[in-house]
Amino acid sequence: HFGRVDVLFNNAGIGAPAVPLETLSPAQWRAVVDTNLNGPFFCTQAAFRVMKAQTPRGGRIINNGSVSAHAPRPMTMPYTATKHAMTGLTKAASLDGRAWDIACGQIDIGNAMTEMARPMAEGILQADGRVASEPTIDVALVAQAVLDMARLPLSANVQFMTLMATKMPLVGRG
């Protein structure tokens, strides 16, 4: 409608069943990779084309990473691998976009209360084998953080931000 792309927020993400690695099917692996990595790549590629050609040129890309980009949960290899890869996508897009005034950053979210995080509040497998509930944060806090990143002038960038519940287990997942 307006002929511009000023902000892209790559926010899609799914997990696979929390099962031992050897029982994960190729289809389950591919579904997570297609949604969590290939989708953001192709959206970023399309945004780059528009952002380079528009006047004034440039724009901002914000990727939804995860605290799983830093530390895995038990039996979440597909999700964890794609979120680590998202960090690489963010860094590469940030570097490649610099000459075109395209800023790219990543927000790593931990336990924002969505349908995906509901099991965490109810009780989820921990690194030590226990099942424990984890604290969550209101999604409005995440929305505000993304808006704050989006509102920056293109001369400034939040490269990485982690937003999580203060008492959420993260380092070592314990």
Task: Give the ranges of each region predicted by the language model.
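C-terminal helical subdomain
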Residues: Q106-I107, L125-G172
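Substrate-binding pocket helix/loop in short-chain dehydrogenase/reductase
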Residues: V19-L21, Q28-R30
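Active-site helix of classical SDR
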Residues: T44, T82
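A short helix-coil junction within the Rossmann-fold of NAD(P)-dependent oxidoreductases
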Residues: H1-F2, G15, V19, A46-G58
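Alpha-helical segment proximal to the catalytic Tyr-Lys
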Residues: R49, L95-R98
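Active-site loop immediately N-terminal to the catalytic Tyr-X3-Lys motif
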Residues: E22, A71-M77, E134
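Residue(s) in the substrate-gating loop at a strand-loop-helix junction
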Residues: S66
